[in-house]
């Protein structure tokens, strides 16, 4: 007995020393047990409703109203493919915040890893397209006004916008209807009959076909060898180089023509000056003595006028008339 009590006392002391930790552990265990009981009661109450339906989420024992009521629309209200509002189960007056919240909820349901009946990669990609269109005010306004930007038939990634889809569709249309889209292998005429209109069709265009053709009219092909209409970079650079060379040649030609015209003008001026000088020399040689005589006469007249002016002023005495001599008595 003494040995047994001796062995028991240390345990009692140790239990007293660790009593606060043990108390905390008991309280946490009690709380966990209560939560497990409440979860068991909730799951048992909803077992009758969930027994007929598969679990809508992994590790979740309850279902919200959206998961129970939502099914991905295969057709829209008008009979065609569903629009983005129908895909996201939203009204057209939904706000941006409502669109964002609805997207987060539907992404969990339509994800390929989800157990929802509508979960699939295609539905998840369509949901991403709808969210990308409705999350931006510009694309949403354009869709509401014109209807453009939404095409369920095209397979695109989740990060692709409606403008990218339109661009890809335009490139595909140009590729199918490119410059070489008219397949020459399906022509129904000989090469010698090219360009004869309805009797032979246009060369390489499958235009107006022969009259025995059942279609009896113009029916362009829907596919071709996929040659783009737009020009490649080497061809574009070649065209730019040729155009630059032509423009440079034109400017060089104009510059040479202008220089030649200026040179001709200077030559003409020199010729005119030479002719004027020769004419002046000829007139001086022919009528020089007459002009010299006229000049001398004018000079003498000027001198006479100056002498008369001086005489009037009294600087020069004017000679009187000659004296008359008496008659001689020689007679």
Curated annotation (Swiss-Prot):
Changing residue 111 to Q: Decreases cell population growth rate. One of its GO terms (molecular function) is heat shock protein binding. Residues 275-303 form the IQ domain. InterPro entries: DnaJ_domain, J_dom_sf, J_domain-containing_protein. GO terms for cellular component: mitochondrion; nucleus. It holds the Pfam family DnaJ. Residues 35-66, 203-226 are annotated as: Disordered. Induction: Induced by high temperature (at protein level). Residues 83-147 form the J domain. Belongs to the DnaJ family. Mitochondrial co-chaperone required for ubiquinol-cytochrome c oxidoreductase (mitochondrial respiratory chain complex III) activity. Interacts with QCR2. This is Mitochondrial respiration co-chaperone MRJ1. It comes from Cryptococcus neoformans var. grubii serotype A (strain H99 / ATCC 208821 / CBS 10515 / FGSC 9487). The gene is MRJ1.
